[in-house]
Amino acid sequence: MLSSTAAWAQIETQRIVEPIPQINTQNIYRVSADRTPSGFAVPRYVSLKFTKVNARTGPSRDHPIAYQYQRRGLPVMIVAETEMWRKIRDISGDEAWVRKPALSGSRTVIALNPTSLRKKPKADAREIARTESNTVLKLESCNETGWCEVRSEGGFKGWTRKIDLWGADL
């Protein structure tokens, strides 16, 4: 059984914007890659590069730190960007600004519930391992039938349903 301490941690949580409903990709305004400073479309998922990442109320070091993420590899969604700053949204719906160097293009996801990793992308395929809720997994790929291939920190690699993951819907 795979286990994980809290997949994310915050110091002094503070709501920065109005409450955000569950992520619904139909309600996300997409900006094409040719219209962003990075050359990548927004929104998109990335992960935290460091164990500690300061999240600020605005896109500069002059803005106060709202909270600090304490989980390397945590998936976040970029919802806006400037040349050096990215506005991110986490699994809780909180939004804050972080510096571009604190983010990695490596794709990770969070298991929303205890999740089976299966040998093949089928519900009746052999179970290889189980994860607990809030486990961060590396996203390898997703297929058109709603299954994603993921890898655990312990090296287990298998398939799980896309709907059981946060960070795989774009």
Task: List each language-model region with its residue ranges.
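N-terminal signal peptide c-region/cleavage motif recognized by signal peptidases
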Residues: 4-6
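Short, small/polar residue-rich loop motifs at catalytic or cofactor-binding pockets
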Residues: 62-63, 123-124
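SH3-family beta-barrel domains
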Residues: 10-57, 68-72, 79-82, 86-119, ...
